[in-house]
Design a protein with these regions (language model features):
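RNA pseudouridine synthases
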Residues: 1-197, 224, 302-311
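Pseudouridine synthases involved in rRNA/tRNA modification
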Residues: 1-32, 64, 80-85, 201-203, ...
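Short histidine-centered loop motifs in beta-beta connectors
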Residues: 43, 226, 231-234
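Short, surface-exposed secondary-structure edge patches
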Residues: 47-51, 232, 273
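Short, well-ordered beta-strand micro-motif
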Residues: 59-61, 232, 282
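Short beta-strand micro-motifs in enzyme catalytic cores
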Residues: 95, 174, 229-231, 277-279
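Secondary-structure transition/turn motif
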Residues: 99-102, 207-209, 233-236
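Long C-terminal interaction/binding lobes of large macromolecular proteins
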Residues: 219
Length: 316
């Protein structure tokens, strides 16, 4: 464990202060460490956007070889991303990017979605490694899921969108293919989601239990092809693995899903990642003048490869 006593002349964001002290703590590493409760500010877990001041105490439960990794690697991790992010929308406040399946949104590796976004912004002349603010993820997608992710370009956008997403004000719609045709073809699923931390999965239960969170998922069948169904799914709540667990709970798991799916079918069809795409984002009405232009806008990712194949009947 490392204990840092903050020494700075002016209030500084927690993530920026830590990066100044340990350049190896990339945005991905910082986000991962925070999720794992490895960063404490004055004894408590705090958002990375929190301003630290002289006299504050930071505890880091991070291995020394991670903290000192900058001595072995030249430059920030985003410079080593394989390619700039595929941008769907760009404005002064946010980026909306299309995440490929198989790319992590963040983490210790170089080629993450966030690093691809930083590389894009650097090439546009909008971001440099010593900037006071580092663009940040506003929400996450599982590594195997493709689709739209919002990245804040300003502290104000980060605060606003984190709040809007937490309060379910941003409407998210997904496309997916299930192994099995759901009956009825259109429905709203309820229940409670319970995490199994030891196995890294979640399960849907009918009755409320300690630690379980209420979930609601709405689906609509677009087309069927043999054993498969193409669905449009709307998240009413937004929990870990919610769509994957909910569809599996009714006997129609997402095709390609190795955790909740039918692995023999996945092998037969040679699918590496789940056929799940965060396809559509619809913005709420914003009253803040700097964000009013985004009110009610809807954004779409390109339709995934399996969409047309189910419509054509070539994937079945």
């Amino acid at each position: 464990m490392k204990i840092l006593k903050v020494k700075c002349l002016a209030p500084t964001r927690l993530d920026n202060y830590l990066t100044q002290q340990y350049p190896a703590l990339t945005p991905g590493r910082l986000n991962k460490a925070l999720r794992e409760n490895k960063i404490k500010l004055n004894g408590k877990k705090q958002p990375l956007s929190t301003r630290v001041m002289a006299g504050d105490k930071i505890k880091l439960f991070i291995l020394d070889d991670v903290l000192d990794a900058d001595r072995r690697v030249e430059g920030p991790a985003w410079k080593n991303a394989r390619t700039p992010a595929q941008v769907v929308y760009d404005c002064p406040q946010i980026l909306i990017v299309n995440k490929p399946a198989g790319v992590a949104v963040d983490g210790p590796e170089d080629d993450t979605l966030l690093n691809r976004a930083l590389l894009y912004l650097n090439k546009q002349g909008e971001y440099k490694e010593n900037d006071l603010y580092t663009p940040a993820l506003c929400h996450r997608l599982d590594t195997g899921t493709s689709g739209l992710v919002i990245i804040a370009k300003t502290p104000e956008a980060e605060e606003l969108f984190l709040s809007a997403i937490k309060n379910r004000e941003v409407q998210k719609t997904y496309l997916c293919v299930t192994f099995g045709r759901p009956m009825p073809p259109d429905a709203t699923l309820g229940g409670y989601l319970l995490k199994d931390a030891d196995r890294g999965i979640v399960k849907i239960v009918e009755d409320k239990q300690p630690g379980a969170k209420e979930v609601e998922t709405r689906y609509e069948t677009i087309a069927v092809s043999g054993r498969l169904a193409l669905l449009k799914v709307q998240l009413i709540t937004g929990r870990t693995h919610q769509i994957r667990a909910h569809m599996a709970s009714i006997g129609c798991p997402i095709l390609g899903d190795s955790k909740y799916g039918n692995n023999s079918a996945n092998r037969e069809l040679k699918l590496k990642y789940q056929a799940l795409c965060a396809w559509e984002l619809t913005m709420p009405r914003f009253t803040q003048p700097d964000f009013a232009f985004l009110s009610g806008k809807t954004f779409h990712a390109p339709k995934p490869w399996y969409y047309q194949q189910v419509l054509d009947g070539t994937l079945k």
